[in-house]
């Protein structure tokens, strides 16, 4: 942690796949589970750690809500802002939803669609359930690699043997309607694949790959449009773009929700050292933000981190 070798306590799957993490609890038992887990972290001799980092808690997660509103002593726990997740509430019909986009976005999408159809003989879109579609996963990784290979000096963290194996095995554990691949093909060749999960009538845009040879046609944007259509047609209420505030996401939405990490440092030497470095880094970040804000507006911003009780 910050170049200090530490024993870290984290969610299973941390930094592997999930953007939204949380405690798993039976409905109605969320608060009691949170209290029990936090008590065990504080007092159990089995919870030996230097750094506790429960990452990727969105603001409607069970653990975030408990820590943010609890009046009991949450000594040493700190909620640190991590990233924003753009998302859009879907209308009841695709046409109605499209009318909610800006006029410039609708015009750009229509122009790119017409250009693609004029240039190519055959343009086909399709949606495939994640279950039973391993070929679509292969196409996704192939297109993802092709796109990133075209960007010199940049490297994807998704296209690795470990994540390929993880996702391949994951597809065999899913049930029908847990998600879909949205594929756009040109002249019988896939040029864009989107990897979408579904949960409780919410669609989550997890990953994508597209052929850079079709960049001029906005092939990725056109496929997102088709994925949103399919999400609406299958009863989804929201379309979540997950972490990352890339400009293209805000062509389809204006809203976002924040994700946080719960931090706590152990009482040992390494835990105290990691905690000191964490606070110093936070002060430096706030100082840099203050200087930037002073140059821009002349006023000093507040901290985005919420320490529930400092150590």
List where the protein language model places each region.
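Polar/charged alpha-helical tracts
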Residues: 35-39, 148, 172, 289-292
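Active-site/acyl-donor-binding loops of N-acyltransferases
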Residues: 61-95, 100, 180, 186, ...
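Acyl-donor binding region in acyl/amide transferases
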Residues: 1-81, 200-257, 263-264
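A conserved beta-strand-loop-helix scaffold within acyl/acetyltransferase catalytic domains
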Residues: 1-14, 53-216, 306-311
